[in-house]
């Protein structure tokens, strides 16, 4: 139980379509309609390729997207299909190459170096995308908050959590986030005034033991909802008096950087 009165509705399950594309279109349509109604959808289960359908909802809304993915891998394998269909290890290519392009920025949180090839890292650097290695953030999960703060949508792969805490995944491994770190990431996502959808993917109950992963996912959702109901509403910027502006010049460039800090939250 939380300290606030919540308004939550279980809309049931989206059944798999005859083709994968049918499932994508169903998810895309539902997510887009809910966002139009100012309702934040929480997607549970399914492969992480559903992230692509979640992203397509913003195309329907003609809205630029800042996408954050919590994952131990970069799911950028070559996708040879020219249709809407993809899979859980190639969906990012589908998003990056999608036309028209509504992707404003992409960030990965928690990648593990031995799962990522150097070509993928070079692609991230070339596109000016953010990628934070697990070793950089483990034990200092608060470093994820500035990245999550700008996200419009978030995709959380359960395999990014260590197998001892979340074994209900075909790709579960010995390393990853601790359960409490995953919950903190979800709380940060809930705090984000800009976030309008979130998905938790790759949960497979066939691999679960004593419902432990299901319990952890429930706690992650609880933390997200708790964060949502504690939003400070300091985005977008309404009154200049509510913010402190810092300006700095770059010595080698003729550009000025402007930082804006909320007096309400110190963010």
Give names to the regions the model predicted.
Residues 1-200, 204-267:
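Conserved alpha-helical scaffold segments that buttress catalytic/binding sites
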């Amino acid at each position: 139980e939380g300290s606030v009165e919540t308004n939550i509705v279980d809309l049931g399950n989206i059944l798999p379509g005859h083709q994968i594309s049918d499932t994508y279109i169903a998810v895309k349509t539902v997510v887009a309609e809910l966002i139009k109604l100012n309702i934040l959808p929480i997607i549970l289960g399914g492969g992480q390729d559903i992230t692509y359908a979640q992203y397509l909802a913003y195309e329907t809304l003609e809205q630029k997207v800042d996408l954050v993915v919590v994952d131990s891998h970069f799911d950028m394998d070559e996708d040879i299909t020219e249709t809407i269909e993809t899979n859980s290890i190639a969906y990012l290519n589908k998003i990056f190459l999608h036309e028209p392009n509504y992707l404003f920025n992409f960030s990965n949180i928690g990648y593990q170096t031995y799962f990522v090839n150097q070509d993928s890292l070079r692609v991230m650097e070339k596109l000016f995308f953010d990628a934070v290695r697990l070793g950089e953030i483990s034990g200092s999960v608060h470093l994820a908050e500035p990245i999550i703060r700008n996200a419009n949508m978030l995709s959380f792969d359960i395999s990014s959590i260590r197998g001892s805490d979340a074994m209900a995944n075909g790709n579960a491994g010995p390393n990853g986030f601790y359960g409490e770190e995953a919950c903190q990431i979800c709380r940060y996502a809930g705090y984000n005034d800009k976030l309008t959808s979130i998905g938790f993917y790759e949960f497979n109950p066939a691999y679960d033991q004593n419902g432990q992963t299901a319990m952890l996912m429930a706690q992650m959702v609880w933390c997200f909802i708790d964060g949502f109901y504690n939003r400070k509403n300091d985005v977008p910027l309404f009154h200049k008096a509510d913010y402190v502006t810092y300006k700095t010049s770059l010595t080698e460039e003729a550009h000025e950087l402007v930082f804006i800090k909320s007096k309400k939250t110190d963010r």
